[in-house]
Amino acid sequence: MVRMATKPPSMTPTPPTGAPPRDDGGSVVLERRTQRTQPPQMYQVVMLNDDYTPMEFVIVVLQEFFGKDREAATQIMLKIHLDGKGVCGVYSRDVAATKVEQVREAAHKAGHPLQCLSEPVE
């Protein structure tokens, strides 16, 4: 058995629930919402002190791979020497990992046990 509607449907369509309200012209009005994305987690590249790697080699590595001038490289090298470790720079995760690998490879080729790592900035 088929049932028929007793009254004809209204001619003005009603917007579905949750849809933006329509203005007089029948067009849909959308609101632009600005979305904020979180900045990427940053990582610091840390060089560790050892008793065998020459200070001059550490300075050269800081200049070559981290773009430090002679004075800044010397200051970081002294911090590494005196405190046991020092921050070479702060980068995104991929860049920090690349820098760590560059330092390790250069140290290995030169026959030095210099260690370098990256850790999240807190």
UniProtKB/Swiss-Prot annotation:
Gene3D superfamilies per UniProt: 3.30.1390.10
Q: Which Pfam families match?
A: ClpS
**GO terms (BP aspect):** protein catabolic process; proteolysis
Where does this protein have compositionally biased stretches of type Pro residues? 10-19
- Which superkingdom does the taxonomy of this entry point to? Bacteria
Q: Please explain the role this protein plays, according to its UniProt record.
A: Involved in the modulation of the specificity of the ClpAP-mediated ATP-dependent protein degradation.
Q: Which family is annotated?
A: Belongs to the ClpS family.
Q: Which HAMAP family match?
A: ClpS
Protein name (Swiss-Prot/TrEMBL): ATP-dependent Clp protease adapter protein ClpS
